């Protein structure tokens, strides 16, 4: 499995903003992340976290924390058998001898991805102006693109995005992943596919409306840059 993260600071979220963020999280989980099979998302109040953070696998009977929407500490195995969210998504990890775990430098459990966050360390509120956002998953590209969507959304909400370095056994990476994606669009192919005639001028206008940066055109070919939040 993979992990990536970023920090957003100087953000002022209302209760409605948080509701929108959670709605987006669940919509991404259900659709793009394929019901958490490819990736999952977590939000954490930065003020409660001590760096560095660690993502690893642990014996489910040694995992114990109070999950979201619960009042009592539960082991990893109990979460899958008793907690509603654990029952719903437990099939993603219940065949493993060890479960994924995300902890801070003090040993505080932040979450058990892709199942559920800790109630104490993994629940944000309107009083939080600094938030850690992470994605974990088995499909790295989906995980990276999901993180980019969230970074763009939180930036649009007024937050300042800070990168987080991830240390893998094979090397280091910084997230989010905002590299430009250049693409070439051949209008002959567009016309053949859509069955309509379209001029370069009209095509550039429509692409701009869709959020693409049109860099130029050479005859019947248009050059665009794809924003990192466009995964289609």
Question: Where are the regions a protein language model picked out?
Answer:
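RNA/tRNA-interacting regions in translation and RNA-turnover enzymes
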Residues: 1-232
